[in-house]
């Protein structure tokens, strides 16, 4: 029965693909919030990921891993899942690719799912020292943490209310024990040792625009600007275009209400 799913020719599913336009470093008002961004190769087809964990097993509780697909917007390959027990027939979903997961294997979702690589489970059901990814922050929300290639989190301790998790950045955080995640590690995208920056203007294809130093500007345009000749910055710490200190200063707000759940800040 599994072999019949693998015989499908194309996995470019129309109802899971949308047109997405880049922001080019602008916000909703059109002002530049991130400098030196713009241009690049045109990529319209954005594949929608299912990060809802199948509504905790209510919409469907199991699926088959069918095939691997390339995604130009992410640094990781995607897995195509064929949903089994759903109300609507012939449904496919895109998920992040789990390491050491074989094509044709069955994936389960929900509180009753067994301890198996690729399954979506609550945090309190997973063993200590296990690798997890695609972790929720809020209950019945979407998976938000650890979604990039070759990044994994580790469960350190399970308590009555909270679970202690170590993130890839080195931050140790408390999360509610009923939050969902996926058991296993994320697959690594293979890199080829090839010099891709061999032509002039290749950075423009990577959406990198020329960046002008602040010291080369006038005093009106940048905090570092102005002065006769090669003048110094004039501050103890370097400043951004909007006057905010950076390079050696922590910019996280001290009175953030989520800071009490951080046991150890990132390195």
UniProtKB/Swiss-Prot annotation:
Compartment(s) where it occurs, according to its Swiss-Prot or TrEMBL record: Plastid, Apicoplast
Entry-linked PROSITE patterns: RIBOSOMAL_L2
Classification via PANTHER family: LARGE RIBOSOMAL SUBUNIT PROTEIN UL2M, RIBOSOMAL PROTEIN L2
A biological process from GO: mitochondrial translation
NCBIfam families in the cross-refs: rplB_bact
Pfam families: Ribosomal_L2, Ribosomal_L2_C
GO MF entries: RNA binding; structural constituent of ribosome; transferase activity
Domain of life: Eukaryota
Oligomeric form and interacting partners: Part of the 50S ribosomal subunit.
Recorded family membership: Belongs to the universal ribosomal protein uL2 family.
Gene Ontology CC annotations of this record: apicoplast; mitochondrial large ribosomal subunit
Keywords: Apicoplast, Plastid, Ribonucleoprotein, Ribosomal protein
Descriptive protein name: Large ribosomal subunit protein uL2c
